[in-house]
A protein has these predicted regions:
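Extended alpha-helical targeting/anchoring segments
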Residues: 1-291
């Protein structure tokens, strides 16, 4: 790893640099309590591996190239990760590399095969394995550059890792002016269901709850609008108007995802697993009786 000062650059400026350098990159950042930036923002680019799944077909491309037909796609991911485990090094940021991407709702079908899951155009999952990470330390106003390397050929791979660190530092220090972000006209949205249809869905859901069939459900609508430019301009607005514990900007070959979420569904850190879903959560009691 390598440290450089970050007092003259922001995570968004870094993201813009990555956008000019790579077709596959990400930014992960967080605001705690809706008012204070978390210590780290994480960025990465040029993943060494991409793993996608659709209808039980897992495709790996990059460091490994193969296709696997399976009804347990997560087992393929576990197998891949077993070959890319990094040691825990005291003092480094909590994320030093790994898979970044998304799991679609259709993944539920592998755990509950009896459910009739409607699959859309999205893959069941789309994950990229990043061995290079830029960790922006808001507290110390430093950037930690991290490169992971394989140990099968230490001298050769160490040389490549050092070269990658130099390239990352040069990318961050590049002062070439970037073109301004374009802002298009106000978008026109269309919805996949009408207001009347959605009202009926909500009423039917309430009936299920009153009858005791279910205790909660999340109903949603999909709004769509054509948009020709990068979502980065919209993400800049999103992160300032709706700062949240989990904010993401992800770009894969021109397809972009941005999101802002308050919910910790599952978190694993230092061997401790935490879940705190917003929907249905209630305070724990101090005793079993209070629970």
């Amino acid at each position: 790893c390598r440290e450089i000062y970050a007092d003259m650059i922001t995570p968004i400026a870094l993201l813009r640099r990555l956008q000019t350098r790579s077709d596959r990159f990400f930014l992960l950042e967080s605001v705690e309590g809706g008012e204070k930036w978390a210590r780290y923002s994480f960025l990465g680019y040029d993943p060494i591996l991409r793993a996608t799944c659709k209808n039980g077909r897992v495709t790996l491309e990059g460091a490994e190239n193969r296709t696997v037909e399976t009804d347990k796609p997560l087992s393929v991911l576990r197998e891949v990760l077993s070959r890319y485990r990094a040691p825990h090094i005291e003092g480094l940021p909590p994320f030093t590399g790994g898979f970044v991407g998304y799991f679609a709702y259709a993944m539920l079908g592998y755990a509950e095969p009896t459910l009739r899951i409607k699959r859309g155009a999205w893959d069941d999952f789309d994950l990229m394995l990043f061995d290079k990470v830029i960790a922006y330390d808001h507290l110390k106003q430093k950037i930690v550059l991290i490169v992971n390397m394989q140990t099968d050929n230490v001298l050769e791979n160490y040389g490549k890792a050092c070269a990658s660190l130099e390239a990352m530092a040069a990318l961050i220090g590049d002062q070439t002016p970037l073109p301004p972000l374009r802002v298009t006209a106000k978008p026109q949205f269309t919805c996949n269901v009408t207001e009347e249809q959605y009202t009926n869905i909500v009423e039917k859901t309430r009936d299920y709850i009153f009858n005791g069939d279910i205790f909660q459900a999340v109903q949603s609508r999909q709004f769509t609008s054509p948009y020709a430019d990068s979502l980065l301009s919209a993400y800049r607005v999103l992160r300032t108007t709706n700062p949240s514990p989990y904010m993401v900007f992800l770009s894969v070959d021109g397809d972009e995802i941005m999101c802002s979420s308050p919910e910790t569904l599952v978190r694993l850190q230092d061997g401790r697993l935490t879940t705190f879903p917003v929907a249905g959560s209630r305070p724990r009691g101090k005793t079993e009786e209070e629970d």
